[in-house]
Amino acid sequence: MHMNICLLPGDGIGPEIVAQGTKVLDAVARRFGHTVSTSSALIGGAAIDATGSPLPDATVEACRTSDAVLLGAVGGPKWDDLPSEKRPEKGLLGIRKALGLFANLRPAALFPELAGACLLRADIAAAGLDLVVVRELTGDVYFGQPAGIETRDGLRTGFNTMIYDEDEVRRIARVAFDTARARKRRVCSVDKANVLATSRLWREVVEEVARDYPDVELSHMYVDNAAMQLVRWPAQFDVIVTGNLFGDILSDEAAVITGSIGMLPSASMGSGGPALFEPIHGSAPDIAGQDKANPIATILSVGMMLRLGFGLAAEADAIDAAVRRVLAEGYRTGDIMENGRTLVGTVSMGNLIAERI
C-alpha cells in the first residue's frame, strides 16, 4: 500500500516528536512492504510567524489531498497576546472544521510497565484501565449560536448556546458503537439528561442507534457521576461517548489518571476524508529543542493512523509491541523516568522503537 501523509509539525516540541513518528512509520513500511510519501505544512504559531495566519489555505489544501494527517502540537506563550481569532489554537479548530472531523477518539490505557506512575490507589490500578473516550467535536456549546458578551439592564452578561441536532448525535453514536464492537462491546453514553434538554435528545438518539447494535451493551451515566466513577473504578468502562463539552473534560481526566500523559495518542475522524492523528499533550515550549520530549504518544498516534486510517491492524500491532518492548527493557524519557531505569532522549527513544519494529 502507498500512504500519502501530510505532516503538521506545529510548535514547541512538535517538529521533534513528528520526526520520530515518521521514523517509526518508515520502519513499519519497510517491514511490511508499504511505501510512504510525506509533505509538511504550517499550522499554529509557526504558520502565524510565516504567513500571519494560524491556518494558511495551502495547509488546508495539503491536508485535503493527503490520505491522513499527523500533527505535532500547537501553541505557546509567544502568541498568548494575540486576538483570540489569530491564536495558534484556531489553526487546530480550523483544520478540524475544514476536514469535517466530528469524532475525537482518545484511548486511555495504563501501561503495565508504568503502573507505578498511575495516580490511582494500587488496588484500583491493579483492576486495569483501558478505555476510549469518543467525543463529538463540532457541535455543543463550543459552536452553538448565539454566543457572546453584551450589556443587559446595565450588567455585562455572557451567554452561549448548547445545541445538538439528531443527525450530529446519531453519527457520533455510530462511531462509538463501531469502536466498541472491535473492543469489549460496551458503550457508556454520558450526558446530563436530568437537567438539559440537549442531553435528553442525546439519550433518545443514542438509544435509537443502539437498536442497530444488539451485540453491544449500552448504559447511560450522568456526567458528574462519570467524573467520579473514572477515578473510583475505571475498569468498568470500555467506550465512553459524549458531547463536546463533557468529552473535553472527561478525556483529560481519563488521560491524567494514567500518570503518563506523554504516552497517549488520539484520532479525529470524519466521514470519508483524511483523518487527523496527534498526541494529546501540548507543545511544551520549555523543553523544545532540548531532546527531552517523549515521542511515544506521537508514535502511538502513527499506530492509530495505520489501524483506523488504513485498516492495517498488524502494522499497528507491531508499533504497540515495539513500544512495550522498549519500556520493558527499561528505557525512559524524563517525564516517565523511574529509579533503576535508563534515561534516553527524544531521538534515542525513536531509534529504539524503530529498531524493534
Swiss-Prot record:
GO terms for biological process: L-leucine biosynthetic process. Keywords: Amino-acid biosynthesis, Branched-chain amino acid biosynthesis, Cytoplasm, Leucine biosynthesis, Magnesium, Manganese, Metal-binding, NAD, Oxidoreductase. Its EC number is 1.1.1.85. Mg(2+) binds at residues 224, 248, 252. It comes from the Bacteria. It catalyses: (2R,3S)-3-isopropylmalate + NAD(+) = 4-methyl-2-oxopentanoate + CO2 + NADH. Pathway: Amino-acid biosynthesis; L-leucine biosynthesis; L-leucine from 3-methyl-2-oxobutanoate: step 3/4. It is an enzyme of class 1 (oxidoreductase). This is 3-isopropylmalate dehydrogenase. It comes from Nitratidesulfovibrio vulgaris (strain ATCC 29579 / DSM 644 / CCUG 34227 / NCIMB 8303 / VKM B-1760 / Hildenborough) (Desulfovibrio vulgaris).
